[in-house]
Amino acid sequence: MKRTYQPSKLVRKRRHGFRARMSTKGGRKVIAGRRAQGRKRLSA
């Protein structure tokens, strides 16, 4: 059986990266929430 997680740096950045987050209203909300919480890493 093939495993579900097949790591790819490119896909990770495109789907969960900072620019991907900033491109939608909901994504900006995620970044704002993580900033408010004081996260060291805001996105992938």
UniProtKB/Swiss-Prot annotation:
Gene3D superfamilies membership? 1.10.287.3980
| InterPro entries the UniProt entry points to | Ribosomal_bL34, Ribosomal_bL34_CS
Q: Where is the composition biased (Basic residues)?
A: 10-19, 26-44
One Gene Ontology cellular component term attached to this UniProt record is: ribosome
Q: Which GO terms describe its biological process?
A: translation
Q: Which domain of life is it from?
A: Bacteria
Q: Per the similarity annotation, which family is this?
A: Belongs to the bacterial ribosomal protein bL34 family.
Would you tell me the protein name for this molecule?
Large ribosomal subunit protein bL34
